[in-house]
Amino acid sequence: MLKVNADFLTKDQVIYDLVIVGAGPAGIASAIYGKRANLNLAIIEGNTPGGKIVKTNIVENYPGFKTITGPELGLEMYNHLLAFEPVVFYNNLIKIDHLNDTFILYLDNKTTVFSKTVIYATGMEERKLGIEKEDYFYGKGISYCAICDAALYKGKTVGVVGGGNSAIQEAIYLSSIAKTVHLIHRREVFRSDALLVEKLKKISNVVFHLNATVKQLIGQEKLQTVKLASTVDKSESEIAIDCLFPYIGFESNNKPVLDLKLNLDQNGFILGDENMQTNIKGFYVAGDCRSKSFRQIATAISDGVTAVLKVRDDI
């Protein structure tokens, strides 16, 4: 059983059994199971509830739904959670301290939240191209969310960078809206599911640029041209484009917990054992921010459930 020394708290401050950071599939699953176990818990979510799936056009691999849009699935999950009337802080987490066996969570609205345990389920952040003017053109021709911004480019020319499932899925989606979709991939072979690739290859308004990387973003007030460089012979070419959607992977969203000195893998993802317990007692990790081999909706939910059941047993 976890013993908490909370002598530094004032009498009107609540100390929760559990605070869950993130309301994606992992966090929502944790919260549902936690509420059913009668844990006194709270959730912190500074972005759209539902997590990364709300930026996905179509989900076809989640049991119970042959085909469902990402926003619809995220809303279904979140409405299920809301039926339990949880405490939710709709704020961004700034940092976490650990004092006298109590976790202190600082939010961007100056609120401070106290808890015996934490399940950290913040998912991942989109990896940027890392080239000049990328931040400058964000919202002016650079977007990391096709489902959010595709309608702005109806009948126009767009590009997608990447070769995984996300890139291929969003290229398929954009092909139904844009005049032309340029798919830019640094390799000859895609990492995406073969069925998705075959589907994309059958779409007439998709142009493939394989063995190519984005070298330069060109434009004045907005993005106008993308310069590509061949990974084979270094030759360069240019594409006139209205918007570029990079889908080149993700990075761990670990900035608020770096001061805790959690054990991380070489890519910055948080290490947890089979029960999602980190090297700090009472601090658990679940979902895509955890170091693991596979990142799917189903695996995130499994992480979240495992973590909260361990919390239930330890409280």
From Swiss-Prot:
GO biological process: cell redox homeostasis; removal of superoxide radicals
Catalytic activity: [thioredoxin]-dithiol + NADP(+) = [thioredoxin]-disulfide + NADPH + H(+)
Protein's UniProt keywords contain Oxidoreductase: yes
SUPFAM superfamilies documented for this protein: FAD/NAD(P)-binding domain
Keywords, sorted A to Z: Cytoplasm, Disulfide bond, FAD, Flavoprotein, NADP, Oxidoreductase, Redox-active center
Molecular-function annotations in GO: thioredoxin-disulfide reductase (NADPH) activity
Binding site for FAD: 45-52, 288-297
The protein's required cofactors: FAD
A GO CC term assigned to this protein in UniProt: cytoplasm
InterPro entries found in the cross-reference section: FAD/NAD-bd_sf (IPR036188), FAD/NAD-binding_dom (IPR023753), Ferredoxin-NADP_redctase_2 (IPR050097), Pyr_nucl-diS_OxRdtase_2_AS (IPR008255), Thioredox_Rdtase (IPR005982)
EC primary class: oxidoreductase
Highest rank taxon of the organism: Bacteria
Major localisation: cytoplasm
Keyword Disulfide bond recorded: yes
Cellular localization per UniProt: Cytoplasm
EC number(s) reported in the record: 1.8.1.9
NCBIfam families: TRX_reduct (TIGR01292)
Anything else known: The active site is a redox-active disulfide bond.
Subunit-level organization: Homodimer.
Stated family: Belongs to the class-II pyridine nucleotide-disulfide oxidoreductase family.
Protein name as it appears in the record: Thioredoxin reductase
Protein's organism: Mycoplasma genitalium (strain ATCC 33530 / DSM 19775 / NCTC 10195 / G37) (Mycoplasmoides genitalium)
Organism phylogeny: Bacteria, Bacillati, Mycoplasmatota, Mycoplasmoidales, Mycoplasmoidaceae
